[in-house]
C-alpha cells in the first residue's frame, strides 16, 4: 500500500492521544489502572478515532492505528525481563536466582499482557465497525478501476 503523506500526521496525532489517555488512566487521582488495562482503553480509542480518519482520506484504518500503537509497546518491561533471565542463568546464589526469576516472570507477563491489550484493543473497533472501515477504501478502488 502507498498511503498519503497525511497519514503520518494523523498517526502522530492518534499516538499522542492514545499515549496521553494511557498516561491519564494510569495516573488519575480518582482511579488508577494498571498499564495493561490502560493500554487496552488507549488502543480502543486509537482504533475508534482511526475509522473517521480512514473514511476522510480513503485509506484503511490500520494505516493509522498500527503506527500509532508503536510508542506504547512496553520495551522497558521486555528489556528488564531479558536482563533478569540472563542474570538468573549466570548467578550461583539461590536467593538471587529466585529474585531474578520473579523479576523475569513479572516483567515478562506485563510485556505479554500489554502487547495483547494493544492488539485486541486496536482490533475491536475494526470488527465492530467493519462496514465503515471497509467502505473507507471502496471509493478509492472504484476510482482506480475507472482510471
Where are these regions (language model features)?
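Membrane-helix interface "capping/anchor" motifs
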Residues: 1-10, 55-63
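Short juxtamembrane and helix-loop transition motifs at transmembrane-helix boundaries
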Residues: 1-5, 20-33, 101-103
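Membrane-proximal intracellular helices of multi-pass ion channels
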Residues: 2-16, 20, 135-147
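Alpha-helical transmembrane segments of multi-pass membrane proteins, especially transporters
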Residues: 7-19, 35-47, 63-72, 76, ...
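Transmembrane alpha-helices that form the ion-translocation and gating core
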Residues: 24-27, 33, 37-60
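C-terminal transmembrane helix-loop-helix hairpin of multi-pass membrane proteins
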Residues: 53, 57-147
Amino acid at each position: 500500500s502507498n498511503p498519503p503523506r497525511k497519514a503520518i500526521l494523523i498517526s502522530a496525532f492518534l499516538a499522542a492521544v492514545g499515549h496521553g489517555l494511557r498516561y491519564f488512566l494510569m495516573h488519575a487521582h480518582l482511579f488508577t489502572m494498571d498499564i495493561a488495562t490502560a493500554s487496552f482503553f488507549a488502543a480502543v480509542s486509537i482504533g475508534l478515532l482511526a475509522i473517521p480518519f480512514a473514511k476522510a482520506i480513503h485509506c484503511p484504518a490500520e494505516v493509522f492505528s498500527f503506527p500509532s500503537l508503536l510508542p506504547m509497546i512496553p520495551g522497558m518491561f521486555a528489556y528488564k525481563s531479558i536482563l533478569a533471565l540472563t542474570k538468573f542463568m549466570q548467578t550461583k546464589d539461590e536467593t538471587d536466582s529466585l529474585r531474578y526469576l520473579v523479576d523475569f516472570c513479572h516483567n515478562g507477563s506485563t510485556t505479554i499482557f500489554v502487547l495483547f491489550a494493544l492488539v485486541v484493543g486496536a482490533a475491536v473497533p475494526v470488527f465492530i465497525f467493519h462496514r465503515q472501515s471497509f467502505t473507507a477504501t471502496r471509493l478509492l478502488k472504484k476510482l482506480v478501476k475507472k482510471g
